[in-house]
Amino acid sequence: MAVGLGPLPTLHPVPGFELGIASAGIKRPGRKDVVVMRCAEGSSVAGVFTLNAFCAAPVILSKQRVQGTVRYLLTNTGNANAGTGAPGLAAAERTCAKLAELAGVPAESVLPFSTGVIGEPLPVEKIEGALQAALDNLSENNWAEAATGIMTTDTLPKGASRQFQHDGVTVTVTGISKGAGMIRPNMATMLGYIATDAKVAPKVLKDLMLDGANKSFNRITIDGDTSTNDCCMLIATGKADLPEVTEASGALFEALKKAVFEVCMEVAQAIVRDGEGATKFVTVQVNGGGNHQECLDVGYAVAHSPLIKTALFASDPNWGRILAAVGRAGVPELDVSLIDVYLDSVCIASKGGRSPSYTEAQGSAVMAQEEITIRIELGRGQCSETIWTTDLSHEYVKINAEYRT
């Protein structure tokens, strides 16, 4: 079940960015599993990609090509084209070349993206056979259809949209994402596509994407696994009648940054809310760290602990598991006598032990909620970090045990 995730909000079209969806029948006949996105001429494109050493063939190709002129993005679901070696790279190149031929653009201007089962050959002919239909379907209004088209084990499509005014001109930022498992970015089995009609210099756009991803997609985790295929792309078409953003400063940049960050955060958190088998949406907030890295180390130790995640599923306030995770996070010279731990506003541990004011009934009441905050005060400094995660349920095991059947 998706925790607090409802129908898609209104996804405003972005002038200069079109999406087309078609069926290749990669995993199921009739399933719309190929999405083509067209960027207007002159668009700037930036991306962040998985750090998994076994990154998929489309990731290798997209990382090479994103530095040049990008006109099309080609996504398929049902097959990750990962762990496929040189033949997989050739297959990705072939699908891009076919799309380029049909669209009349250089092959190097097409970026491929794949998600699905790892280690199986990409069904090139099926994908090639769907490309013309996807091109024929191109429209600025197809965001919702594309959000559904990129889904794998997701139960709901994910998207967000913002608009703001600058000098009387409306600027739009719209994005979609997919992902429900194998989520522990830097990046994870997650794909994200965000577009704006602002005109943004490539260097500014790249930094904006990196910063936005770092504060959103790189702060979510479901199962601790980092996928071979993660990518998040930010496209600026330049169709809004405004000056180009050439510096990371000024009113237009700040408004754009706010909109991009909000869209990134909303679609990233939607991935957690739709986590495979998730029944809880959990915020892990770590304050008082000596540096940001030790805050992240503590946060991920808590967020990845199977014992904590199963306690969350059972609504069991087993606070000792949280203390154990904090203690093994590897923070040097950690003084446990300074640490306080909270479930929402309930102090469950103080100065390294059970809080004198804590009762089991208080903890149980918080743990019974669908949305929970675990707050850890380290008492070592001024740094803070926040991570979003889920519980671990029977359904998660079932989904992943049956994924290939």
From Swiss-Prot:
Sequence similarity: Belongs to the ArgJ family.
Alphabetical keyword list: Acyltransferase, Amino-acid biosynthesis, Arginine biosynthesis, Autocatalytic cleavage, Cytoplasm, Multifunctional enzyme, Transferase
Residue numbers annotated as active site: 189
Gene Ontology MF terms in the entry: glutamate N-acetyltransferase activity; L-glutamate N-acetyltransferase activity
Residues reported in the UniProt entry to bind substrate: 152, 178, 189, 276, 400, 405
Role summary: Catalyzes two activities which are involved in the cyclic version of arginine biosynthesis: the synthesis of N-acetylglutamate from glutamate and acetyl-CoA as the acetyl donor, and of ornithine by transacetylation between N(2)-acetylornithine and glutamate.
Gene that encodes the chain: argJ
Cross-referenced Pfam families: ArgJ
Quaternary structure annotation from Swiss-Prot or TrEMBL: Heterotetramer of two alpha and two beta chains.
Top-tier EC class: transferase
Cellular component per GO, a single term: cytoplasm
Residues under site feature: Involved in the stabilization of negative charge on the oxyanion by the formation of the oxyanion hole: 115-116
Subcellular location: Cytoplasm
Positions of the record's site feature: Cleavage: 188-189
Record-given protein name: Arginine biosynthesis bifunctional protein ArgJ
Pathway membership, UniProt: Amino-acid biosynthesis; L-arginine biosynthesis; L-ornithine and N-acetyl-L-glutamate from L-glutamate and N(2)-acetyl-L-ornithine (cyclic): step 1/1; Amino-acid biosynthesis; L-arginine biosynthesis; N(2)-acetyl-L-ornithine from L-glutamate: step 1/4
Species for this entry: Pseudomonas putida (strain ATCC 47054 / DSM 6125 / CFBP 8728 / NCIMB 11950 / KT2440)
Documented EC number(s): 2.3.1.35, 2.3.1.1
InterPro entries per the UniProt record, alphabetical: Arg_biosynth_ArgJ, ArgJ-like_dom_sf, ArgJ_beta_C
Any one biological process term the GO annotation gives: L-arginine biosynthetic process
Catalytic activity from the UniProt record: N(2)-acetyl-L-ornithine + L-glutamate = N-acetyl-L-glutamate + L-ornithine; L-glutamate + acetyl-CoA = N-acetyl-L-glutamate + CoA + H(+)
